[in-house]
């Protein structure tokens, strides 16, 4: 029986997601053994600065792809929001799993919703996308950077001077946290999610046909189509997890895709948002990018990048 080695990050969330993938494959009765290999990525190692300042794309992916390239692992399990918009030609995303809740949530110390937080409250996030939208909604609060895995951030909320933190609903739900922890689900009109948020990506070598066919059994067509549109938008904007870009797509009953894209200034003073419907997912991503670029989105992102390079 062939053994398939699956690589992932070392966090409890990453391991939970990977074990979920293995469970799904086992339920299909596939004739393989599975082994999990934990890999530490650059994004996991550097925790004393914000993600935007760590710089580069694929902060949580490159080391896992290196293990894939060398044959040390056969499959990489990623959170789709961590996957760069362009894959190297030697790799393929054989499956994108059905999306968990794509929204962000607010977890607050005193049970305050975003609108109820007192002026001057400190909100923790590691994302420029989240900070831009939080400050746009509540310019009277402060955003303070917070890094670490889910458990670390929840502990910091209790032990440090944060009034609230913003996390992905999907991660909390996969770890078993529920309404006793989540104060408020942030509507997508308030905080548009990251590209691919809530979906998992299963990556393998493009020449490994057997593994590609195996993983394809877990591909969710509707999620895949939506995420394709989002990633086309991200690619066209030349974005990554270190710039303030959001995007969320849904597939309508007739098969068309509705995509909303967002670019914001980190201080929240400018939020550009456009929505458009189309039948061809990747073309739609380009069209939404063009609409935002015409409003000045490119200039906002260029300013962010130059400030990051200078810091």
Swiss-Prot record:
GO terms for molecular function: hydroxymethylbilane synthase activity. GO terms for cellular component: cytoplasm. Its EC number is 2.5.1.61. It comes from the Bacteria. The keyword Transferase applies. The modification S-(dipyrrolylmethanemethyl)cysteine is found at residue 241. InterPro entries: HemC (IPR000860), Porphobilin_deaminase_cofac_BS (IPR022419), Porphobilin_deaminase_N (IPR022417), Porphobilinogen_deaminase_C (IPR022418), Porphobilinogen_deaminase_C_sf (IPR036803). Its cofactor is dipyrromethane. Binds 1 dipyrromethane group covalently. The keyword Transferase applies. Keywords: Porphyrin biosynthesis, Transferase. Pathway: Porphyrin-containing compound metabolism; protoporphyrin-IX biosynthesis; coproporphyrinogen-III from 5-aminolevulinate: step 2/4. Pfam families: Porphobil_deam, Porphobil_deamC. It catalyses: 4 porphobilinogen + H2O = hydroxymethylbilane + 4 NH4(+). One of its GO terms (biological process) is protoporphyrinogen IX biosynthetic process. Monomer. Belongs to the HMBS family. NCBIfam families: hemC. HAMAP family: Porphobil_deam (MF_00260). The porphobilinogen subunits are added to the dipyrromethane group. Tetrapolymerization of the monopyrrole PBG into the hydroxymethylbilane pre-uroporphyrinogen in several discrete steps. This is Porphobilinogen deaminase. The lineage of its organism: Bacteria, Bacillati, Bacillota, Bacilli, Bacillales. The gene is hemC.
């Amino acid at each position: 029986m062939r053994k398939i080695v699956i690589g992932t990050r070392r966090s409890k969330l990453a391991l939970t997601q990977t074990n979920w993938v293995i469970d799904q494959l086992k339920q299909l009765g596939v004739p393989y053994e599975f082994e999990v290999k934990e890999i530490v990525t650059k994004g996991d190692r550097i925790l004393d600065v914000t993600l935007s300042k760590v710089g580069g794309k694929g902060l949580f992916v490159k080391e896992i792809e290196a293990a894939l390239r060398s044959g040390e692992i056969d499959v990489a399990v990623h959170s789709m929001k961590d996957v760069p918009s362009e894959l190297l030609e030697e790799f393929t995303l054989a499956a994108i799993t059905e999306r968990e809740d794509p929204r962000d949530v607010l977890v607050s110390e005193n049970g305050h919703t975003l609108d109820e937080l007192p002026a001057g409250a400190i909100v923790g996030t590691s994302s420029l996308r989240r900070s831009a939208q939080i400050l746009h909604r509540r310019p009277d609060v402060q955003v303070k950077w917070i890094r670490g895995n889910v458990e670390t951030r929840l502990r910091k909320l209790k032990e440090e001077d944060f009034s609230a933190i913003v996390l992905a609903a999907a991660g909390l739900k996969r770890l078993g946290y529920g309404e006793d922890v989540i104060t408020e689900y942030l509507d997508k009109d308030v905080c548009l999610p990251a590209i691919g948020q809530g979906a998992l990506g299963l990556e393998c070598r493009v020449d490994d046909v057997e593994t590609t066919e195996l993983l394809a059994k877990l591909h969710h067509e509707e999620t895949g189509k939506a995420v394709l549109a989002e990633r086309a938008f991200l690619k066209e904007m030349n974005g990554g997890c270190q710039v303030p870009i959001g995007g969320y797509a849904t597939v309508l009953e007739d098969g068309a895709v509705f995509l909303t894209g967002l670019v914001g200034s980190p201080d929240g003073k400018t939020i550009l948002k456009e929505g458009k419907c189309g039948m061809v997912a990747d073309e739609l991503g380009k069209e939404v990018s063009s609409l935002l670029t015409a409003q000045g989105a490119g200039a906002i992102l260029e300013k962010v990048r130059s400030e990051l390079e200078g810091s």
